[in-house]
C-alpha cells in the first residue's frame, strides 16, 4: 500500500498478487469510502502512512458480510473518488488504484462563470510574457530509469532540473515558467500537454534522464516534435518507452477508445506544429 499526494488529489495504490474485482461506495457522518475486494486478504499488516497534507485520515480493514476483504478509508472531508485496476507494467505487478479528489475544489472548478458585460472596443495586439511549460518526466509510481550503482531515480533528477530551469526562465525578462509537476506524483501524458494549453504555454519542454546500454555515453540529446513520427530507431525506442509511462504511472484507459485517443493525439500534435 502506497500513498501519493498531487495538487488536485490523493492517490492510494494497493499492490495485489493478481487481478481483483472490487466494489466502492461512499458513507457519510463521518465521511468514509468502503472498498470490497473479492477473494482477497491482507498479507501481513498494512504499513503506516503519512497522511499529512492528504485527504486521507486512516485506513482500516475487515470483512464484509459476503466474506470479501473490506477496506475502509476514513476521510478528512467530502471527496469524489475514482478507482481502477492496472495490469502489470515495468517493475510493478497488478495494482488497484484509488484517487481521492476534493469535492469542494471540483465543484468550484465546474461552476459556470458569468462574465460582466463589456464595451466593444477595438482589439489591441496582445502583449504578454512568453510562457514556458517545463515538464519533469515520470513521477510518483513511475520512477523512470534507475541507476544501477546508486539507484538514482530519473523522476528525481528530472524534477531537480525542471525546478532549476524554472528559476532561470523566471529571471529572464519577457518569459514566465510553469511547472507541469512540482512534486513526486504522476501526471498522465495527455494531462501534461492539457495543463500547458490551459495556461496558454508557448513552449513545451519535456525533461528526461534516460538510460542507455553503453556506459561510455555522456552529454545530452534534444528531440523536437515531428509530423513524420520518430526519425530513427533510437528515437522510436525512446518514444515507445516514454509513451508507456501511463501504464506504469497509473492512468485508467477504461473510459477511452484507444484508437480514437491515438488519432486525436496525432491530430493535436500536428495542429500544434502548424500553429
Task: Map each language-model feature to its residues.
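Signal-peptide-cleaved, periplasmic/extracellular N-terminal interaction regions immediately downstream
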Residues: 1-132
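Short clusters of hydrophobic/aromatic residues that line enzyme substrate/ligand-binding pockets
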Residues: 49, 56-59, 146-147, 238, ...
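Catalytic-core regions of hydrolytic enzymes
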Residues: 111-258, 269-274
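Flexible glycine/proline-enriched surface loops and loop-helix/loop-strand junctions
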Residues: 261-267
Amino acid at each position: 500500500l502506497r500513498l501519493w499526494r498531487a495538487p488536485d488529489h490523493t492517490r492510494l495504490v494497493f499492490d495485489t498478487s493478481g487481478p481483483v474485482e472490487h466494489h466502492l461506495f461512499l458513507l457519510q457522518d463521518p465521511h468514509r469510502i468502503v472498498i470490497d475486494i473479492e477473494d482477497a486478504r491482507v498479507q501481513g499488516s498494512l504499513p503506516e502512512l503519512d497522511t499529512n497534507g492528504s485527504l486521507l485520515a486512516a485506513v482500516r480493514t475487515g470483512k464484509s458480510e459476503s466474506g470479501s476483504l473490506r477496506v475502509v478509508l476514513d476521510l478528512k472531508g467530502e471527496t469524489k473518488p475514482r478507482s481502477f485496476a492496472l495490469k502489470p507494467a515495468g517493475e510493478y505487478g497488478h495494482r488497484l488504484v484509488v484517487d481521492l479528489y476534493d469535492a469542494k475544489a471540483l465543484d468550484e472548478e465546474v461552476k459556470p462563470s458569468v462574465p460582466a458585460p463589456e464595451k466593444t472596443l477595438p482589439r489591441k495586439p496582445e502583449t504578454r510574457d512568453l510562457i514556458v511549460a517545463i515538464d519533469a518526466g515520470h513521477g510518483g509510481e513511475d520512477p523512470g530509469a534507475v541507476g544501477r550503482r546508486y539507484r538514482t531515480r530519473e523522476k528525481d533528477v528530472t524534477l531537480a532540473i525542471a525546478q532549476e530551469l524554472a528559476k532561470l526562465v523566471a529571471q529572464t525578462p519577457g518569459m514566465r515558467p510553469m511547472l507541469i509537476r512540482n512534486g513526486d506524483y504522476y501526471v498522465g501524458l495527455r494531462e501534461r500537454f492539457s495543463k500547458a494549453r490551459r495556461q496558454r504555454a508557448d513552449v513545451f519542454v519535456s525533461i528526461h534522464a534516460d538510460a542507455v546500454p553503453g556506459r561510455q555515453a555522456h552529454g545530452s540529446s534534444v528531440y523536437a516534435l515531428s509530423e513524420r513520427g520518430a526519425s530513427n530507431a533510437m528515437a522510436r525506442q525512446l518514444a515507445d518507452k516514454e509513451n508507456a509511462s501511463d501504464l506504469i504511472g497509473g492512468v485508467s484507459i477504461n473510459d477511452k477508445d484507444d484508437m480514437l485517443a491515438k488519432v486525436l493525439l496525432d491530430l493535436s500534435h500536428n495542429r500544434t506544429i502548424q500553429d
